[in-house]
Each structure stands twice: as C-alpha cells, then as structure tokens.
Amino acid sequence: MTETLRVAVIGAGRMGADHIQRLSKRIHGAEVAAVVDVDLARAQAAVEGIPGAVALADADEALNNGDVNAVLIATPGFLHEDILLKALARDIPILCEKPLTPDAESAWKIVQAEEKLGHKRIQVGFMRRFDAEYAALGQVIRDHELGELLMLHHQHRNPTTPPGFTNEMLINDSVVHEFDAIRFFTGEEITSVQVRLGKATKNAPAGQHDPQHVLVETESGVLADVEIFVNAKFGYEVATQASFEDGIVSIGGDKGPYTRAAGRWGGNVTPGFEERFGAAYDVEIQSWVDAALRGEIGGPTAWDGYATAACCEAGVEAQKNGEKVAVKLNARPALYS
C-alpha cells in the first residue's frame, strides 16, 4: 500500500461533508481525491479549498479512477450494495457508514463477496466503539474488573426527527447503534429482540410510536434494554449503565460545567450527535486509515454489519407483532473468526 490513502468520498450530504472536512483537515495519512454526489453542485462545493480533489456525479467514475485507492461510502443505505461490490472488485480499503446494507439478505451478499476475496477490506461505521467512554467500559468488561457482566441498560434520546422518519427507522437508524454496542460490549451475538410500545408522546409525528422499549438477549443470557425516544425535545442523550456481579458502571450523559448563579443551577445539554461523538468519529477514521495502510481494517467488520442488519430485521418484526423474535444468522465465516 502507498503511504497515503487517496480517498473517494461517495455522498456529500451531512455525514459525507463532515468526513470530507475530517479527512482534509484532521486525519493523517489520507487525503480527499474525489467527492461524488448525484447533486454535482454539492460535490463541487464540498471540494472547494481541497487541492487536487475532483467533484463527480457518478460513483463508477471515481471507482475507475486510478488515482483513487480507497473509498468512504456515505450515501443512503439503499445505495451501498452496488458501490460495495464494485469497490471489493477493485480490492481497495472501504469505510462504509452504517448500515452496511438495509437488510440481512443483501448484507450477506457483501459478506460472501468479501469472503471470496480472501481478506477483509470493509470497515463499517459504528463510531461508538471509538468513543473513550465506550472503550473504557469495554475494557472493564473484558478485564472482569467487577465480575461478570449481567445486564445493560441503554437510553438513546434525540431532540426531534427529520421529515419522513418512520416507525421502522427507530430500529433501523437509531437502535441499530445499541445493537452494535451490545454485541461490542458482550462479545456475543444477540439471539432475540422484543419491542414494547407503551404510552406515546404527543410530539411524535403521524405513523411514529415514540418512545419504544426494546428488550434484547445475548447468547450467554445477558439481558439488555433500550429506551429509544427520538422526539425527546430537550437535547441529545446517549447513555449506558452496565450491571456487574460486583458493581455498576455508567457512561454517557452530560458532564460539562455545572453552574450555580442568579438563583439557578445546572449545565448544558448536548444538542446533537456531532457534538457528542465528534471525537469518536476522528478516532474511527484515523483507525481506518492507519489500518488500511497496513493492509488491514481498524474496526467493525462486514460481519458486524450483517449481524446488526439481522438484529434490525428481528426488531422491526417485533415492533409489528409485539412478540419476542429470534435473530436469524447464517454461520460466521472463518474470515471473521
């Protein structure tokens, strides 16, 4: 591998634009070679001020560009499969924002294609694994510092949702992060998902039941629950409490300056995910670049993307029938053992 990744960023929307700035200003060992967006004007705006970067409207043109030796995919999930297969055919490093693909069937095709290649090229963008608090909790679990992990309690709260955010998206776009976190913390697959729908907020748009309570079980019997509340209004909050045999560990929440003044006390609430996980995104992309330059990946694999897609399918089914739904997984290929 060369000493520099020349990255084609495919998708210049909110997430793609953020990664373009990250790669061009804060990440070492990589540079933006091309930006692709169906809205060419948006791609052109994204490359302004980045020497040598070209704006394109077609992903194939970027993937066929010999000057490009890595790809970062930040398009909507339904476009991922085709881009992933073409990038795998080129055998170049890939960072794919979640989801790997929108469903388990297509995600399995990606796993099979990478397995056929014979080595891992895809890193999936579950950035919470790179958050300092998540990493610290993961270390406590692996070191058995407080005995065995017994239960996990997650809260995932957003101030509001964009237009078109459906009931299924509470699982596919939001709880997907907790599914990956549970797998990351336990080192186990999730075996079942149940979703309970209780009293709903008046702030939820038509067709969306909010909040929801998601119940999860892993292979060894670790129980986890997720409160997903995407119209919480007050701000953005992602928190986890882990129950061990010999103690409790809590991460997340707001721990900024605590002020007492003029007859009041308190602090500030994090407004959004960019502020909460901005540093984690930086660590994630740097890890991908460093690993790619060694011919490796530096984070979640295509198998992780497939497994979370299967969890999401079980979660959406559980939303609809109210039952405990088994997660259906194919056998894990040796490549991901």
Swiss-Prot record:
Keyword Ribonucleoprotein in annotation: no
Catalytic activity: myo-inositol + NAD(+) = scyllo-inosose + NADH + H(+)
InterPro entries in alphabetical order: Gfo-Idh-MocA_inositol_DH (IPR050424), Gfo/Idh/MocA-like_OxRdtase_C (IPR004104), Gfo/Idh/MocA-like_OxRdtase_N (IPR000683), MI/DCI_dehydrogenase (IPR023794), NAD(P)-bd_dom_sf (IPR036291)
Keywords: NAD, Oxidoreductase
Single Gene Ontology BP annotation: inositol catabolic process
Domain of life according to the entry: Bacteria
GO molecular function, one term: nucleotide binding
EC number: 1.1.1.18
Gene3D superfamilies: Dihydrodipicolinate Reductase, domain 2, NAD(P)-binding Rossmann-like Domain
Keyword set includes Protein biosynthesis: no
Cited function: Involved in the oxidation of myo-inositol (MI) to 2-keto-myo-inositol (2KMI or 2-inosose).
Subunit structure: Homotetramer.
Family as reported in the entry's similarity comment: Belongs to the Gfo/Idh/MocA family.
Name of the protein in question: Inositol 2-dehydrogenase
